[in-house]
A protein has these predicted regions:
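Acidic, histidine-bearing metal-coordination/catalytic regions of metal-dependent phosphoesterases
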Residues: 1-54
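Extended active-site neighborhood of metal-dependent phosphoesterases/phosphodiesterases
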Residues: 20-30, 95-182
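An acidic-aromatic substrate-binding cleft motif
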Residues: 31-81, 86-87
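Short secondary-structure boundary/capping elements
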Residues: 60-63, 92-93, 135
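A short acidic, amphipathic alpha-helical/loop segment
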Residues: 64-69, 93-100
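Short glycine-/acidic-enriched loop or helix-start segments at secondary-structure transitions
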Residues: 64-65, 89-90, 123-124, 162
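Short, exposed beta-strand "edge-strand" segments with a Pro/Gly-rich flavor and a Y/T-containing core
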Residues: 87-88, 173
C-alpha cells in the first residue's frame, strides 16, 4: 500500500504506477518480469462549482450505478458510501469496488470510500482492510480534497452486536468507542 499526500498529488497533476510481475517467488533468486509503468493524469478538486457523484448500496451491481453516474457528466470526485459489494463472502466481490472507480474516474479523480454494514458480513469480512482503501488500516479517517475537509466515520453494523443475525461475529460497539478517541 502506498499513500500519497493529496497536496503533493494536486501539485504534480499526475502519478505513475509501477509493478513488477513475479513469475516464481522463491526464498532466493526469484524470477520476475520487467517493470511495467503507467502514468495517469490527476485533476485536483476545484475550489468552487464542485461536482461529486455518490454511490451507496450497489450490492454488486456495476452497470446501473455507472450508467446513472455517466448521465451527470464529468465529476470532480467520487464517493462510494458502503455496501458497494453484496457482502464479503468472496474476495472477487472487492473487484467491483475498483471496477466502478476505474470506469468513473479513470484513475484521474479522487475517491472517498467508506465501508457499509453488509461489508462486515462473510468469510472475508475480517480481511476487508486488506482489499479496500483504508487509512493506516482504519476504515474511519479525515480527508481534504480541494477546499473540502471531511471526516468519515464507520458505525459498523446497524444492530446491536449480540443480534442473532451476526452469530457472535461482530464487535462494532467497541469499534465505535475507539472512533470517539479519534
Amino acid at each position: 500500500r502506498v499513500e500519497v499526500p493529496a497536496v503533493e498529488l494536486d501539485k504534480a497533476k499526475e502519478y505513475t504506477i509501477c509493478i513488477r510481475p513475479i513469475i516464481i517467488r522463491k526464498a532466493y533468486f526469484s524470477k520476475t518480469k520487467k517493470v511495467l509503468e503507467k502514468t495517469y493524469k490527476f485533476y485536483p478538486v476545484p475550489e468552487s462549482n464542485i461536482r461529486a457523484y455518490h454511490i451507496a448500496d450497489a450490492h454488486n451491481n456495476i452497470e446501473e450505478p455507472i450508467k446513472a453516474a455517466e448521465t451527470f457528466g464529468d465529476i470532480d470526485f467520487l464517493i462510494l458510501n458502503g455496501d458497494v459489494i453484496e457482502d464479503s463472502s468472496n474476495p472477487k466481490n472487492f473487484m467491483n469496488i475498483y471496477e466502478i472507480c476505474s470506469r468513473l474516474t479513470k484513475g484521474e479523480r479522487p475517491v472517498i470510500f467508506s465501508r457499509g454494514n453488509h461489508d462486515l458480513r462473510g468469510n472475508f469480512a475480517e480481511k476487508f482492510a486488506d482489499y479496500t482503501p483504508t487509512h493506516k488500516g482504519n476504515t474511519y479517517y479525515n480527508f481534504r480534497i480541494g477546499s473540502i475537509w471531511g471526516i468519515l466515520l464507520d458505525c459498523g453494523e446497524d444492530k446491536n452486536d449480540n443480534h442473532e443475525e451476526y452469530g457472535h461475529t461482530v464487535a462494532c460497539h467497541i469499534f465505535r468507542e475507539r472512533q470517539t478517541d479519534f
